[in-house]
């Protein structure tokens, strides 16, 4: 499958905007949660970088596969992104904390992070999807 320049630009824009959005949302959340400490704003760039890697590994290949059916703001695509996001967050949690891997399902942050990450990527993918 060959990618033309327009499609490649769309993938890159989706990846960049999703990573920056994710970093901004969770970085600002940590800024407020830390009591408005200015140093917490550095986390925006750190979170955006980690989001870029995660989106590149998990969401970008899925995006290429889902783009075979070109539908903007498809609820089915959103649910697929959510399922992959749950799997990705679980995988990273399992690698970091193997003995406590199942405790993450009791964590509210697990669900929020997964759903927000999926929503952000799905939203930007739908915005940059061109017919």
From Swiss-Prot:
Q: Where in the cell is it found?
A: Cell membrane
Membrane topology category: Multi-pass membrane protein
Question: Keyword annotations for this protein?
Answer: Cell membrane, Membrane, Transmembrane, Transmembrane helix
Q: Which GO terms describe its cellular component?
A: plasma membrane
Question: Which one Pfam family would you cite for this protein?
Answer: UPF0715
Instruction: Tell me where it mainly resides.
Output: membrane
* Segments crossing the lipid bilayer: 12-32, 38-58, 75-95, 108-128
Similarity comment: Belongs to the UPF0715 family.
Q: What is the protein's given name?
A: SPbeta prophage-derived UPF0715 membrane protein YopD
Gene that produces this protein: yopD
């Amino acid at each position: 499958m060959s990618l033309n320049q327009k499609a490649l630009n769309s993938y890159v824009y989706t990846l960049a905007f999703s990573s920056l959005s994710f970093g901004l949302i969770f970085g600002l959340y940590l800024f407020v949660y830390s009591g408005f400490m200015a140093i917490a704003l550095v986390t925006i760039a750190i979170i955006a970088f980690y989001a870029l890697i995660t989106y590149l590994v998990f969401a970008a290949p899925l995006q290429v596969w889902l783009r075979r059916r070109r539908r903007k703001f498809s609820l089915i695509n959103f649910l697929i992104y959510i399922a992959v996001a749950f799997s990705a967050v679980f995988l990273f949690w399992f690698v970091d904390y193997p003995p406590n891997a199942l405790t993450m399902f009791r964590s509210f942050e697990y669900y929020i992070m997964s759903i927000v990450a999926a929503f952000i990527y799905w939203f930007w993918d739908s915005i940059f999807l061109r017919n």
